[in-house]
Design a protein with these regions (language model features):
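Active-site C-terminal subdomain of aminotransferase-like
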Residues: 33-45, 50, 87, 93-174, ...
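Distinct, well-ordered alpha-helical segments
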Residues: 81-89
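PLP-dependent aminotransferase-class I/II
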Residues: 1-46, 50-55
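Catalytic PLP-binding core of fold-type I/II PLP enzymes
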Residues: 49-81
Length: 243
């Protein structure tokens, strides 16, 4: 298997790149057909930026014209609708198989769903077993998922409403520098110049707020937006940060 990474340093892959490699692979001394295109969206290593939906449509049409399968690494794909206006079904319809995390969205202790047509999924349990996925008592890992599934997208929208209120409150204090990620989804960037990160994290934790560790070079906190913010109010959170 020959893996070819594309879109270096970017979140959105472009059809032109794919065409180049499909044609190059087919035209070598030993022709090698591209069998699968895998796309991640949102892209974790790019601060959860989302891939351009219109570009995905072009890629999907091209892949199907050329007999190439498409896989979506959509671990956090239930966040996409709020930002792109496109539903989970609209995204999934462009792909032959889709991966969704159960713990990143729905509070499962672990686990994921791999979805696809019957022909693809039938017999997949043999592959799962090969990688140790046949635990006889795995149900506790996903027992709570159904409790959060139906309301997740609504809860996520409310989470961003609360986050925007928090950001507005913090921006009224010039000690805080905040940036939203272009084409972003569930993350914003927070910088607090002149503050010792370890001390800030410790003081926040004393008030029940768990902070991520900042970037080792820039000192930026990569703040994740999720429904845990709804456990309190933006005003209370802002007071914790400011004090």
């Amino acid at each position: 298997m020959n893996l070819i990474p594309l879109a270096q340093g970017r979140s959105s892959i472009e059809l032109a790149e794919i065409k180049h490699w499909v044609e190059r692979s087919a035209g070598g001394r030993v022709p090698s057909k591209v069998g699968v295109i895998s796309v991640e969206s949102p892209v974790r290593r790019k601060n959860d930026e989302m891939v351009n939906f219109e570009e995905l449509q072009l890629i999907s049409a091209y892949a199907r014209e050329n007999g190439i399968r498409l896989h979506l690494d959509g671990a956090r794909m239930f966040n996409l609708h709020f930002h792109s206006g496109k539903s989970v079904k609209q995204y999934a319809a462009l792909f032959d198989s889709v991966y969704v995390s159960l713990w990143k969205h729905f509070n499962g202790a672990s686990g994921a769903i791999l979805a696809g047509d019957t022909k693809f999924i039938e017999g997949m349990f043999h592959t799962r077993r090969m990688f140790g996925g046949s635990l006889p008592h795995a149900w506790p890992q996903v027992a709570v998922v159904s409790q959060y599934l139906d309301s997740y997208e609504s809860d996520y929208e409310k989470s961003w409403q609360a986050t925007d209120e928090l950001i507005a409150l913090l921006q009224s204090d010039n000690r805080f520098k905040i940036e939203k990620v272009p084409n972003g989804t569930s993350r914003f960037l927070l910088l607090i110049p002149g503050v010792t990160a370890d001390g800030f994290i410790e003081r926040a934790l004393e008030h029940g707020v768990m902070m991520p560790h900042p970037h080792a070079v820039t000192g930026v906190f990569q703040m994740q937006v999720n429904p845990t913010i709804l456990r309190t109010t933006p005003e209370k959170l802002a007071r914790v940060f400011m004090n």
